[in-house]
């Protein structure tokens, strides 16, 4: 994914403009790509940014299709990757 923003539609049909934090590929749950994003202007109760993730497939016709993360183990892998990259960026 080359654009730095995406629009996510929630289960109620509301659109949320989100900043792409980073993307990565992983083979652990089949060859998948993942996107970590943060809804622009939305924060949690402590005022910290909200982060979320989805799998995605590149698609020439649509540009890309977002897919749900399917299992707790897959979420844990995404969370570990996010934490590792966040720690590396803090160290810089």
UniProtKB/Swiss-Prot annotation:
Any idea what this protein is called?
UPF0473 protein BC_4380
Q: Which InterPro entries match?
A: UPF0473 (IPR009711)
* Classification of source organism: Bacteria, Bacillati, Bacillota, Bacilli, Bacillales
Q: Which family does it belong to?
A: Belongs to the UPF0473 family.
PANTHER family linked: UPF0473 PROTEIN CBO2561/CLC_2432 (PTHR40066), UPF0473 PROTEIN CBO2561_CLC_2432 (PTHR40066:SF1)
